[in-house]
Every structure is written in structure tokens, then in C-alpha cells.
């Protein structure tokens, strides 16, 4: 667990809580950021939250986030923000993504952050992919890492 202790609903503008959450998940897993296949973003669809999270993703994953080799998406466009239940529902979606080898869609995105133009951000159609290692970013202070050792599609 990690947190920036900035505000109950607003992240610190430099993304320190999200950076700490994802960095801790990577450290605990023993993985390098380039070894992560999928990231489930918190993506609250708030201007501040999305900007801070995008900054944190770029900081932690650098070129890996924009090259197309890291798939990332969010389920909130499909289900809304379920407040206290959001993390559990995102975890379920992510486990299903791993099980089926399909990154979840990011629905209702009209203008993705231009920094991620070349990233694999499934907006309209799902794409089968081998998901071996994921980071599930559940918000300001929660993170989960899952590493699957299979060499084949799940």
C-alpha cells in the first residue's frame, strides 16, 4: 500500500502516490517496468486525476508506456466509479483479462492523452494478447501485481 496523503479524493499534482504505488508493486514483484504486459489504470475521468495518472504512468514505465508493448485500459468508462467497490470490481475485470488473454476495453474516451498516441489503449475493439504480468492500480493508495509465468496466451 502507498499513498501521498494529499487529499481524500484528489491526488498530489506530481503523481507521487501513483508513482509510489506502481513502483512498490514492481519492487515487490522483482520485475522491471518493461516486463509488465498490462496495466489497469484507475482513470477516474477527472481532468486532474487523469493528468496525474498519465504523468505517473509515463514516469514509471517511460518509453514502454508509449511504444505499444504495454497494454493499459480502464473499466470506469463502462461501469462508472463505484467508490469503495471500484478496486474490487477492477480486480475482477483484471483477473478476467488475464484468464481470457484480452485487455479490457476503455469505453467512452473521446480524446486520449496525445502522449499515448502510439500506446496500446484498447478503445474500440479488444485484441488478444499474452498477459503474463500486470499492474493493477486501484487508486491513490492501492496496488496489486500479478505475474503469470506461462509462455503461451492465457
Residue positions per predicted region:
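Conserved "HGTGT" condensation-loop signature of ketosynthase/thiolase-family condensing enzymes
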Residues: 1-154
Amino acid at each position: 500500500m502507498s499513498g501521498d496523503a494529499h487529499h481524500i479524493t484528489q491526488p498530489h499534482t506530481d503523481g507521487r502516490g501513483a508513482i509510489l504505488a506502481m513502483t512498490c508493486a514492481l519492487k515487490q514483484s522483482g520485475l522491471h517496468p518493461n516486463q509488465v504486459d498490462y496495466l489497469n489504470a484507475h482513470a477516474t475521468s477527472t481532468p486532474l486525476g487523469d493528468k496525474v495518472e498519465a504523468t505517473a504512468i509515463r514516469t514509471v514505465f517511460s518509453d514502454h508506456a508509449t511504444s505499444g508493448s504495454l497494454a493499459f485500459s480502464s473499466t470506469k468508462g463502462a461501469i462508472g466509479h463505484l467508490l469503495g467497490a471500484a478496486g474490487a470490481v477492477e480486480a475482477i475485470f483484471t483477473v478476467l483479462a488475464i484468464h481470457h488473454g484480452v485487455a479490457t476495453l476503455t469505453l467512452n474516451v473521446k480524446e486520449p492523452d496525445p502522449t499515448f498516441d502510439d500506446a496500446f489503449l484498447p478503445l474500440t475493439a479488444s485484441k488478444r494478447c499474452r498477459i503474463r504480468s500486470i499492474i493493477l492500480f486501484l487508486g491513490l493508495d492501492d496496488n496489486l501485481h500479478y505475474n503469470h509465468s506461462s509462455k503461451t496466451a492465457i
